[in-house]
Structure formats: structure tokens, C-alpha cells
A protein has these predicted regions:
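Residue-level signature of the cytosolic catalytic core of signaling kinases
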Residues: 41, 145, 194-198, 256, ...
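Residues at alpha-helix caps and immediate loop-helix transition turns in enzyme cores, especially N-
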Residues: 41-44, 94, 145, 197-201, ...
Length: 354
């Protein structure tokens, strides 16, 4: 039986990964360490709360004693780090939090793994161990109208969020180069799908449109992103963990580049047609001041992971957005719970005066 220590898996991508792995593998153990910040939600794991293969631990990846104890107790074969503050707008307001979670938290995980797995006298690592860092294409910066990010593209982050993720990636690489730690890094494009906190574009649009609230669009809305259905991403992480070449970075993209305004209009059209609600229309769109340092285009070339591991994105955007909207409409109680209280205060801070 393989054991995974997965961090941040009460959040969006992490909780989907837990569901994916439990469905795919019977003989598995997932130890899930999550601090349960605003975007970490135990309701994301409600349907597996009685599954003995999943062990939830509330705690911080910065807590050295806790991480050390978990590694000693469960002896994980893999440590996969999903834990991160991930919203660019929040990083612009409070960059210190991003340094603490994304940089210092990653360094603590790396050091704890090294302490447990590395024999300094023999200069050898325990067999079958690996650390995998889940990162983002935003570490590469911005693209022009043509071309794609490749694994060899220099890191050039533009926001405090992407700077924190790039720094974490460099520490992961440094532990590999300095100590020989077995590692991989995955860098993904924009994920969408179930369980995503509604500060992110697609669930925010769905929630606002249902309630006939304004749909805020940064600038002209022509910023282009590559959209990756979250379960395709989970499959890629599984394949990299179990088959990725030691020390390698793998880009994970969806081949689904779309301008943000296209996403907005697609969600409006889908909800209008599904709900037969004339109040859901493009009249809800409101262009607001553009985000500071907002990159115009991201695009990923996933050729390497396809050639090395056989992975490819199985879900075209046209299918994925239908699945995603259907999930949120079927889980209104989940949305109501996560958008209460502190979310309302945050939303007002971000958009009230724009």
C-alpha cells in the first residue's frame, strides 16, 4: 500500500485530487494536512469522511513539529504540496501571508522530508520517496500574442502570488540540486471545476449571475488564459508522482485558451438557458479597473508530459464548463455555506468601489 502525505487538500484542487485517488486506487492511504483557512472547507470532503483510507489532520505546513511527527508516524512514499494561498488579488493586499504559506511552508516541508529521508553519512536517500510541488504557470510571467510557456521558460513572476510560488519552486529545485532530493514540480494553467472557492472567476460568475448581481470584469476582459478541467490536472499529478523523471518540471495545460470576457458570456448563456431566467443577461457585466500587473496572456505547452508520461487533457472547455455549471447548480447549499460571513466582507472590499 502506498501512502501519500497531501497538504492543502480541503481546498479546490487538493480535494478533487483526494476524490480522484480514492476512486482510482483501492490500496492507498491519504494523510491530508490542511490548515482550514477561508478556502479550505471540510464540506469538500464530506462524502469521504467515513473512508478509512483518508486521514484528515488539521494543521499548518509551517509547523515543523507536526510535519515531522506525521512523516514519522505514517512514513509517506510521497509528499505532495497543494497548500498555498492562491488568489492574486489577496496577494496584492497582503503579500506577507503569501510568503509565509507559500515560501516558508514549502521550505519547512522540504526540510522535514530531508530530515526523514536522507542519510547524511551515507549521502543516500530512502528508496521510493518523492516530494512533488504543485505550482502554476504564473511563475513564467506573461506571453505575447504567440508562443507558449515551456519548462525551459525563465521564471518572471509579476504578482506577489506568482513571486511566492516561483520562490517555492526554486527552493524545491535547490533541495534537488544541493542534496539530491527526489522531486518533481508541476506547473498548471487555470483550473476550473467542482469545489472551487468563489473568489475565482467561474464560480464567482455562477454565484453572482444566479442572484442577478453584477459580474465584475477586469479591464477590457481580453486577458487570455488556458483553462484546465481540474480532474485532468489530478490525473497529471498522479502520473507525475508515480512516473515522473527525478528532478523534472512538467507543464500541465488544457489547450483551451479563451479570453476572460468569453468565459463571462459563456457562463451567462449557459445559466440563462438552463434556468430560463431572463434576468441573467450580459446587462449584468460591469467592467472594473484592471488588476495591478495583470498579464494579458498565459499559454502552456504540455508536450513534455505527453511525450514522457502519455498525459493529455481529456476535457474540452465546452464539455468542462457544462459539467462545472451543473455541479454548482446541484450544490447550492455548498455555495451558500462558503459565501456566507467573511466571503461577503472580502467581496465588498474587492469590488464595492470599482
Amino acid at each position: 500500500m502506498k501512502t501519500y502525505l497531501v497538504t492543502g487538500c480541503a481546498g479546490f484542487i487538493g480535494s478533487n485530487f483526494v476524490h480522484y485517488m480514492l476512486e482510482k486506487y483501492q490500496d492507498i492511504r491519504l494523510v491530508n494536512l490542511d490548515k482550514l483557512t477561508y478556502a479550505g472547507n471540510l464540506e469538500n470532503l464530506e462524502d469521504i469522511k467515513d473512508d478509512a483510507r483518508h486521514i484528515f489532520v488539521k494543521g499548518d505546513i509551517c509547523d515543523k513539529a507536526l510535519v515531522t511527527d506525521l512523516i514519522a508516524k505514517y512514513d509517506p512514499d510521497y509528499v505532495i504540496n497543494f497548500a498555498a494561498e492562491s488568489h492574486v488579488d489577496r496577494s496584492i493586499r497582503n503579500p506577507e501571508i503569501f510568503v509565509e504559506s507559500n515560501v516558508l511552508g514549502t521550505v519547512n516541508l522540504l526540510q522535514c522530508c530531508k530530515d526523514a529521508w536522507y542519510d547524511a553519512d551515507a549521502k543516500t536517500w530512502k528508496e521510493g520517496k518523492k516530494y512533488l510541488q504543485v505550482s502554476t504557470d504564473e511563475v513564467y510571467g506573461a506571453l505575447g500574442a504567440e508562443g507558449y510557456f515551456m519548462e525551459t521558460t525563465p521564471l518572471c513572476p509579476h504578482s506577489p502570488y506568482s513571486a511566492s510560488k516561483a520562490s517555492a519552486d526554486m527552493f524545491v529545485k535547490a533541495f534537488h540540486d544541493t542534496y539530491g532530493m527526489p522531486i518533481n514540480i508541476t506547473r498548471c494553467s487555470n483550473n476550473y471545476g467542482p469545489y472551487q472557492f468563489p473568489e475565482k472567476l467561474i464560480p464567482l460568475l455562477i454565484n453572482n449571475a444566479k442572484h442577478h448581481k453584477t459580474l465584475p470584469v477586469y479591464g477590457d476582459g481580453m486577458q487570455i488564459r488556458d483553462w484546465l478541467y481540474v480532474m485532468d490536472h489530478c490525473k497529471a499529478i498522479d502520473m507525475v508522482a508515480n512516473g515522473g523523471k527525478d528532478g523534472e518540471v512538467y507543464n500541465v495545460g488544457g489547450h483551451n485558451e479563451r479570453p476572460n470576457i468569453f468565459i463571462v458570456k459563456t457562463v451567462i448563456e449557459q445559466l440563462h438557458d438552463r434556468l430560463k431566467d431572463e434576468g441573467i443577461s450580459e446587462e449584468l457585466i460591469k467592467h472594473v479597473a484592471d488588476r495591478l500587473g495583470h498579464a494579458r496572456r498565459y499559454g502552456i505547452d504540455p508536450t513534455k508530459i505527453k511525450n514522457d508520461l502519455g498525459w493529455y487533457p481529456e476535457t474540452p472547455f465546452e464539455k468542462g464548463i457544462v459539467l462545472t455549471i451543473g455541479w454548482y447548480l446541484a450544490h447550492e447549499e455548498w455555495m451558500d455555506h462558503v459565501t456566507s460571513g467573511n466571503y461577503q466582507k472580502y467581496y465588498e472590499q474587492m469590488y464595492k468601489n470599482k
